[in-house]
Amino acid sequence: MSSVPDIKTLPKLSNPLEDAKRLAAYRAVDENVDFQNERVIGIGSGSTVVYVAERLGQYLKDPKYTKYVSQFVCIPTGFQSRALILDNGLQLDSIDHHPIIDIAFDGADEVDVNLQLIKGGGACLFQEKLVSTSAKRFIVVADHRKQSPQYLGKNWRQGVPIEVVPSAYVRVQHDLLNKLHAQTAVVRQGGSAKAGPVVTDNNNFIIDADFGEIKDPKSLYVSIEMLIGVVEVGLFIDNAEKVYFGNADGSVNVLDKKN
């Protein structure tokens, strides 16, 4: 008999939204990880992915699954996900050693009806893109607020995150506004705890560019990517296989690329 907690009898958390996030993440792990045949797992960042790592840690402690999960190697997308991996007793490794990942889990800032994503609100978009595109299967977990009724840019109003080389940020801002007609293109600042721009793990800046509702994210991605000085764009195109949305009422919606 499995000692992994049954999702139907989980104790309540601090609020319904956290319950929803946990349920979405647990179901994503339960329904997608092939414990006997998969070994390299990508772990992203964000408040919902916390529960992905937690669920994998629960399987690690179950005698029925220990022999499999103890052989997993987990690839992080940043400092937060690195901590999640270690805190749950999972084995940490790097994409340098495992350039092909069996399955990756991450969150999203917004998801449209075609499973196109905006990501990068946490300023880890380059590493997130590297891990997700290196994965044979990419599964997204999020709460219902991240689900757009149609187009990207409907719910997520902070703009498309764009990682840029610091010496080119003025040029990129100019081109976003004047060539691609962004409504705004703002260098993300560090907030009250840090003077100056946010600096990514790769020592670059982030520009948040607002294009309003994005009806053709594929062409916008290509246009931004071609600008000199752009390192990576927070539009994840044709990448996600499934998205699990946790709802406030405790239910989970699943968008599947196959459907």
From Swiss-Prot:
Location of the protein in the cell: Cytoplasm
Main location: cytoplasm
CDD domains registered for this protein in UniProt: RPI_A (cd01398)
GO biological process entries: D-ribose metabolic process; pentose-phosphate shunt, non-oxidative branch
Coiled coil residues, start to end: none
A Gene Ontology molecular function term of the record: ribose-5-phosphate isomerase activity
Enzyme Commission no: 5.3.1.6
Enzyme class label: isomerase
A Gene Ontology cellular-component term: cytoplasm
Catalytic activity: aldehydo-D-ribose 5-phosphate = D-ribulose 5-phosphate
Gene3D superfamilies: 3.30.70.260, 3.40.50.1360
Pathway: Carbohydrate degradation; pentose phosphate pathway; D-ribose 5-phosphate from D-ribulose 5-phosphate (non-oxidative stage): step 1/1
SUPFAM superfamilies noted in UniProt: D-ribose-5-phosphate isomerase (RpiA), lid domain, NagB/RpiA/CoA transferase-like
Record's keyword terms, sorted: Cytoplasm, Isomerase
Stated family: Belongs to the ribose 5-phosphate isomerase family.
Protein name per Swiss-Prot or TrEMBL: Ribose-5-phosphate isomerase
Species annotation: Vanderwaltozyma polyspora (strain ATCC 22028 / DSM 70294 / BCRC 21397 / CBS 2163 / NBRC 10782 / NRRL Y-8283 / UCD 57-17) (Kluyveromyces polysporus)
Gene behind the chain: RKI1
